[in-house]
Amino acid sequence: MRQITKHNRAGKKKNRILLIACMLVLVFLMTGCGKNSDGVIRITNVSYDPTREFYEAYNPLFEKYYEDTYGKKVEVIQSHGGSGAQARSVVEGCNADVVTLALEHDITLIEQTGLIDKGWQKEFDKDSAPYTSTIVFLVRKGNPKNIRDWDDLIQKNVEVITPDPKSSGGACWNFLAALSYAKEHYADEAQQKEFMRKLYQQVSVMDSGARGSTTTFVENKKGDVLIAWENEAIASMKSYPGEYELINPSVSILAQPSVAIVDDNANDNGTQEVSRKYLSYLYTEKAQRLAAEYGYRPSDETILKEYGDTFDLNIRLYTIKDYGGWENAYKMYFDDGAMFDEIYDF
């Protein structure tokens, strides 16, 4: 039986909650002597769901680096949620200095309002993607449904957990990873579409974000397989040793979370310089190794190869360029009336 969680389709309510949270942060900054009046520079990083633990570790690393190097204290304030909803919260007034979101398209939505300068993709290395991931399966111990690849997910006795592409950037990557498999195995577009329809017919719970889907599968014990960020699957196995297994499909997609300075906010807050250093530091050796420890693939190829035991480097990975970039992909698959709406019966 399919279930779309109530908060998933109550998108406006979700956005209001995120906006209220961001406004509380803003009030704190204003009433708590602002960004600098107590001697502490504060910046806000609006990020997506599965990065919580990574940035909890990264922020103290950066704060120490900045104080040791420049003699000034920095405090990084975090906000997390579904990537699409997070982007909309910034558009609607959340006072983010930087965004670290699940996909380029979400940052482009902010750019289109003028809050982020054009050309942000080239401001940092690797198209402003300091770490990457891919999409894998998380199954229960012993893999009771014998899931090995995408075609196993369309079996009638398999319940699939994946978030909603309308609110979750990770869910968009999940969709494209599955479609990449379909493209490998079906030359005809109608057959590819039918495969996707069958897959999403097996989705029993669709949360608004990747972390919500992980909670549904791991903590609430619903479903047979979770379509997940690789880093989220790795984290789940560490948190619940012996209870879950990671299955690498034959075909997936190179998921590239993106980062950017919210230029208008950072300029108004006087944090442009700190914000730039905050994102630049993600590319340092220390930060790249930290990303790997938290299940993200370092953009530094040398460091990535050192973690060959953690990451399957032999998966056939499509890229967003294979879909004509995010603008084209959104138009074809995720906009109102596009493929996802056609195949998924709400």
Q: Each predicted region: which residue ranges?
A:
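Extracellular/periplasmic juxtamembrane helices and adjacent flexible linkers that interface
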Residues: A266-F346
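Ligand-binding pocket segment of bilobal, Venus flytrap-like solute-binding proteins
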Residues: H185-S250
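Periplasmic-binding protein-like
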Residues: A129-T134, M196-Y200, D207-S208, S239-Q272, ...
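Short helix-loop capping/hinge motifs at secondary-structure junctions, enriched
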Residues: G142-R148, S167, S180-D188, N265-E273
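Short beta-strand->loop
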Residues: V46-Y48, V139-K141, E159-H185, L199-V203, ...
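N-terminal segment of the mature folded domain
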Residues: N36-S167, N314, Y344-D345
